[in-house]
Amino acid sequence: MTRLRTLLLSLVALCALGGTAQAQMPLRIYVDAAPLFNLSHAKTLQDVSENKLFVGYRLGAGVDVNVGKMMYIGSGLTFAMKGNQYTFLSPKGEGDIKIYSHYMQIPINVGVRLNLTPTIGASVEAGPYFAYALGATVSQGKILDDIQKTYNVYKDGILGMDGAKLKRYDIGLVAKAKVTFGSWYGMVGADMGFVDELKLDEKNDPELEKLGQKAMRNTSFYLGAGFTF
């Protein structure tokens, strides 16, 4: 029992010392995770009754390098599932279209950190991100053919339409705020994509009018936690 108590006290002390040491270190390595809430808006050719919240994931790792007493530059690698879900109106009635895109994303952020105590701090950061889609699928509910189907958007096109596909890249702005407790931190952030992800070739596919969509950009926010080494 005495050994267990000693071990627990040692772990607590190490965490506290780790937080103090990190405040003085020139760089920090971190990992974090969060659910990603996508608010992407689909601009349509036809009427859309409702754009719905789409929940994905966000997993990240990277390094922050101090460039001043309070300022730092950070970069890393993030994997995120972004997408869009909306209700489509057709002569046959309503149905849902869900777009799932899995991105590998590289942010380049500039941030400011304030150490409130040796183990408690807060920071805000922002900068551009560059993303590449590793894969994407589109799920069609009971609308056009009254059956549910799933398509690979790079091979089959959206809803099987060769003239409607998604672009693999995205460029946008990321902003994030963190509150640190020793080696742990909580975070809230947002991604705003600038690229219209939808690539249409209306001349080659007259059926595109059924899709009812002519633009889509990635917009999302997240609330999660991370650990700093």
Q: Where is each model-derived feature located?
A:
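Glutamine-centric residue-chemistry signal
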Residues: Q22-Q24, G74, Q105
